[in-house]
Amino acid sequence: MRSELDPVTRQFRVSYTVPAGAPEAVTIRCSWSPAGQGQWRPAKVIPFMSDTALRLLPEEPEGFWRQWVTEGKLTELRAAGLERSVVFNPYPEAQPDGRVDCDFRVQIETPAGEVLATHETRLQADNTDVVYLEDWSRVLQPQSLAEKPAREDRKWEYRTGLPEGELLSLGSELYGLSPSDLPLPGLTYPLDLRGPYAIFVCTRARHGIGLRLTGDERTDGLGSRHPTQEMLWRWCRMDRQHLVIENLQSYAGYSNGQLDYVKLVPLSDETLQALEGQFAGPRDKLVAGYFEPYSWAFSERVTETLQHREPLVAFAEAGVQILDAQMGRFGARVNYESRIADQLWGTTFGDPIGHVERPTTDNVGMMQQFTNTCDAELRYARELGMMPHANFGATNCYPNSPLEGRISREHPEWRRGSTLRYEVPEVRAYILSLYREVLEIGAPGISIDFCRYPEGVDQAETLNGFLRELRQLADEVGRNRGQKVPILIRFPAKGVRLWERFDYATWVREGLADYLCPSNIQGRHHHFDIAPYVEAVRGSQCKLLPVVDGLHWGPEMPGPFLWRVQQLYKAGVDGIYVYQADARILGRMEDRRVMRLLGSSSAVARWWEREDALRPQYSKGIYITPYGEEPGYHGWQRLRVWTDGIEMGPMEFYLDDKLVHRCEGPPYLLGTEEYESDSIIPTGPHTLRIRAQDGDGWLEQTFQINGA
C-alpha cells in the first residue's frame, strides 16, 4: 500500500492491490482514524478516475458520489491482481489545525460481505499553508449580511450550525436570494497573500456562485456538481487581490447564490511550471471560436458597452485567435446597430432550458437598447489580440415569432419555409448590404454560417454566384483599406443535410474563401471524413478549420473532444473552429483550460500521452453522455460513451437484451452518426447494456435510459 499527496489539491491518492482471486466485482470500504487511536470512521473518497469520467458521472440521485464521500464505499470491477487507487480528501475531519496525521484503511470485500484483504497505512501532511475561506462574517460589508432575510431585503445570510446531513464542511454556508430584477450587493473577502495559488471552490451540489478577484475584468460562475466536490477555478498570483462574491443571473433574472468554502493552495515554482507546462509548445494551429452575443446576453443584463469586453476576456484567456461573433441571421431581427435590418429590441425566446421548453427574456433586447454590439465586439476583440469576424447565420426568418425580420414579413414570397431564398436577386442584395454595413462599422473579417440552416440554398451554382459577389465586396473594401478582408465559411460536411449544395472545391479554386470550416449539424456527423477537404485546400492560401462542436450534443471534454482534435491534427488541418465556443469558454472553467490546448498540436499530443499512461491506473468504468436540456435521447442526438481503466477496443451495445450496434474502437456511440440511427432508441424506457472488451474478457455495465 502506498500514498502520495497531490501538491495542487492537497488530497491523497492511496493505492492498494486487489487479491488475484477476487471476483468480477469487489466492494471497497475506506476509513480513517486519528493516528494510533483505532477510532475508525468513513473516509471521504472517490475512485481514481479520469477528468472525462468525472464529467460524465451521473448527478444525484442516480450517481454514486454521496455513497463514496459519506460511507467511504465504492465498487471496483475486474480488478483482480491489479493496483487500484482512491482519492482521499482529509478536509476538514482528518485535518485538524491544518495537519493530517491519521491511519487509513482499505478493506476489500466480496459483494456478499466476505473480507478478502485489509490494507492500512499512515497518512501525514502539513497543510497549514492552505487558506480556507468559510467564515463569511469577515466580509468587508457586514451591512449586507442578515439573519433569515426576506428575498426583498436583498441581503446575504451566513448560516451556521446546519445539520451534518447537509454535507457542508463546517456546517455553515453563505446563502443569498434577491428579487429577480435586482442583484444582491457584492461582498468582498479581504486577503493579504503573495505569490501563486491554486483556487478551489465548493458549493452545494448544483448550486452556483459568481466569483472574481478585485483585479479581474469578469466574474466567473462556479459550482459543484456533487456534494463536497472541490472545483478548480484557476491558478494565479494573489498579490494585492481580494475575493469578490456575487450572485449570478439567468434568463429569468437574478438567481440564488450559495458558497460553502474557497480553498487557496500555495504553489511552488516547480508545481506552477508543471501546471503551465501542459499548454507549452509552438502555437502551430489556428483556433477560431464562434461567439453568439444573443446567447450570452440571454442570461445577462447588458446595459453598458464595457460589459461586452467581459466574455471576450475569457475568449482571449482560452487562446482563441479568430473571434467569429454573430450579428444575426438573415431574415431575422439582428443583434447589432443596423440601420438596414430591424434590431431586436423586445422580448425573445431561446432553446429549451431544463423543463422550460420555450424560455423567454427581455435581456437580449436590452443589450440592443443600450449598446452597439458590433462595434463593441470588434473593438474589444482587437484590444485583446484576437482577429474578429462579423458573422451572419445564412438565413432563418423565424416566421410569426418575435425574431422575424421586416424583410420576411414584407416578402414572404422570398422565403422557402423559414429561410430566405438565395436565388432571389433582392435577397442577395439585402444580404450584401448587411455585410457592407458591418464592414463600414469596422469588421476586419466577415463570415457566413450555413449550419444549422442550409435550406436557403437551392443549388451549388446559386451559392457560388453569391460568394463571388461577396468576394467582390470584400476585395473592394480591402483595397480601400490597404488590407485584405478575409471570408470564413461554415458549411455542411459530407453527409450532413443538403451538403451537396456546397461546392467548397470551387470556393478554394476561385479564392472565394479564406477559411473553410466543414461542420456537423446537431448531434450527427461529428467525425466526418476530413481527407477530401485537406486535399481541396492543398497548395492554396485557404486555411482548413474543421468544426468540433462545443455544444452539449458534441464530443464531451476533455477526452472525446481532444480525441477528435488529435485525429484532425494528424490529418494535417490548419486548426480548429469551435461552435459554439461560448458554451465551453463561458461555462465550466475546466473547459476553458481544454480550449487553451488547441493552439498547439504538441500540447494536445502531450495530453494524450499523459492520458494513455494513466488509463490503466483508473478504476474500470463505462460512462455515457446524459440527456440534453430536454428529457430523453432525441433522434438528433447520439448517446456517446467513454471508458476508463481499459484499452480502447471493441464495444457492443445491447438494447433490451438485443445486440443493436458494435464499435471496433472510438469514437464510441450507440449507432452511427448518420441519419439512419435517428430512431435507434425508440420512444420510452429501455435497458441498455454496454460491453467493452477488457483483455480476454468483457467489462459490462447496465443503464436505464429513455428515448424521447
Predicted regions and their residues:
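Catalytic domains of carbohydrate-active enzymes, especially glycoside hydrolases
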Residues: 306-337, 441-442, 513-516, 571-575
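Active-site-adjacent "subsite" loops/lids of carbohydrate-active enzymes
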Residues: 278-305, 347-379, 389-441, 559-563
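Aromatic-lined carbohydrate-binding/catalytic grooves of carbohydrate-active enzymes
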Residues: 320-368, 515-523, 527, 531
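Glycan-recognition and processing domains
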Residues: 126-190
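A short beta-strand element within beta-rich, extracytoplasmic domains
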Residues: 185-187, 191-207, 637-641
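Substrate-binding cleft of secreted/luminal carbohydrate-active enzymes
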Residues: 322, 326, 515-526, 552-615
